[in-house]
């Protein structure tokens, strides 16, 4: 919900799982959120940009979180396609 100034005033804004598009509930304590840093290709240094991925507890419980993060990183161009 937004006020007249356009600022969010909700106490809780739910996240969505990056792999399955499920809403991550407030009581899903098995979910994770990870920031993957983007690195300069020449110098190998962090360039102040990152991608954020949220993985719900159901994906982690199935053991698919590592494959999901790798697939998302390949789609975003963080990891090369032939890795």
Swiss-Prot record:
GO terms for biological process: cytoplasmic translation; endonucleolytic cleavage in ITS1 to separate SSU-rRNA from 5.8S rRNA and LSU-rRNA from tricistronic rRNA transcript (SSU-rRNA, 5.8S rRNA, LSU-rRNA); endonucleolytic cleavage to generate mature 3'-end of SSU-rRNA from (SSU-rRNA, 5.8S rRNA, LSU-rRNA). GO terms for molecular function: structural constituent of ribosome. InterPro entries: Ribosomal_eS21, Ribosomal_eS21_CS, Ribosomal_eS21_sf. It comes from the Eukaryota. Pfam families: Ribosomal_S21e. Component of the 40S small ribosomal subunit. Component of the small ribosomal subunit. The ribosome is a large ribonucleoprotein complex responsible for the synthesis of proteins in the cell. Belongs to the eukaryotic ribosomal protein eS21 family. This is Small ribosomal subunit protein eS21. It comes from Xenopus laevis.
């Amino acid at each position: 919900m937004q006020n007249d100034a356009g600022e969010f005033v909700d106490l809780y804004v739910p996240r969505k799982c990056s792999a399955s598009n499920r809403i991550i509930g407030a009581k899903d304590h098995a979910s994770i959120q990870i920031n993957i840093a983007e690195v300069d290709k020449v110098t190998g240094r962090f360039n102040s940009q990152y991608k954020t991925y949220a993985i719900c507890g159901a994906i982690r419980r199935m053991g698919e979180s590592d494959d999901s993060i790798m697939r998302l990183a390949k789609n975003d161009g963080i990891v090369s396609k032939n890795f």
